[in-house]
């Protein structure tokens, strides 16, 4: 079965092919004989109820600096010309991102969009996890500064995060007596009107933040992301270091708790973040870590994903 695949992502010529999960997905698709097109989210349009993308056919190669060969730009009808869309642009989860999910919702599931765009919109990673009581550390989501002060008084050391964002940007640890809380809250208020997250600090983060990848609710494998010395952010984009790790009984328990909801929502490719015994995020936008997982364990999450996509398309989905 040869599929027509459009990949909505950040500029392809600027990616790091050693770490980029979207690139691994594209390489796997190409190896199976699927035809690839690339476009950035700003090239997506809607006119009279139909959705189009100004896209370029692309071939990908494991060759740094020459990893993508782009063809002439064409206008794709996303319902008639494409079988699968990989929605892989990185956050911020802003109104442009949300609008793109509305566009792609109009063609899904006739054109299979991975992940289901309506559910990507409905499941921001730091909010979606709150649907599963008892899996998180104590967590407050608010724009009420007094509530945040009260939360810190009850829990001591906390971590402050923007509600919408990614890659560890804007994350800060505050000690129980840290005088900088006011300044940080003022900074968040200046940047935007969104609520922030205050979360009880989990000391186990010094040993790493585990990223578990799931395909259609089933765990494929995990990597451990260890923060740089003196840091609490373990994200690879801000200096975290990846290392091999085994899935624990608790990891599998957490996966089992969320799996039915992932399947129901059509969230085929998901990355969850686990610190110690706690689930802290469910990433459904553009999960990373597949390259490192393959390097450490030989497990290719992109292969597992494409097996599932092909099965869905073969059965009329």
UniProtKB/Swiss-Prot annotation:
Keywords carried by this UniProt record: ATP-binding, Glutathione biosynthesis, Ligase, Magnesium, Manganese, Metal-binding, Nucleotide-binding
Listed SUPFAM superfamilies: Glutathione synthetase ATP-binding domain-like, PreATP-grasp domain
EC assignment: 6.3.2.3
Gene Ontology MF terms: ATP binding; glutathione synthase activity; metal ion binding
Domain ATP-grasp: 126-310
Cross-referenced Pfam families: GSH-S_ATP (PF02955), GSH-S_N (PF02951)
Cofactor: Mg(2+); Mn(2+)
Residue sites binding ATP per the record: 152-208
Cofactor note: Binds 1 Mg(2+) or Mn(2+) ion per subunit.
Pathway: Sulfur metabolism; glutathione biosynthesis; glutathione from L-cysteine and L-glutamate: step 2/2
Catalytic activity: gamma-L-glutamyl-L-cysteine + glycine + ATP = glutathione + ADP + phosphate + H(+)
Statement: the UniProt record of this protein carries the keyword Lipid biosynthesis: no
Enzyme class: ligase
InterPro entries associated with the record: ATP-grasp (IPR011761), ATP_grasp_subdomain_1 (IPR013815), Glut_synth_pro (IPR006284), GSHS_ATP-bd (IPR004218), GSHS_N (IPR004215), PreATP-grasp_dom_sf (IPR016185)
Gene3D superfamilies noted in UniProt: 3.40.50.20, ATP-grasp fold, A domain, ATP-grasp fold, B domain
Source taxon at top rank: Bacteria
UniProt-annotated binding residues for Mg(2+): 281, 283
Entry GO terms, CC: cytoplasm
NCBIfam families associated with the record: glut_syn, PRK05246.1
Xref: PANTHER family: GLUTATHIONE SYNTHETASE, RIBOSOMAL PROTEIN S6 MODIFICATION PROTEIN
HAMAP family given in the database record: GSH_S
Sequence similarity: Belongs to the prokaryotic GSH synthase family.
Name of the protein in question: Glutathione synthetase
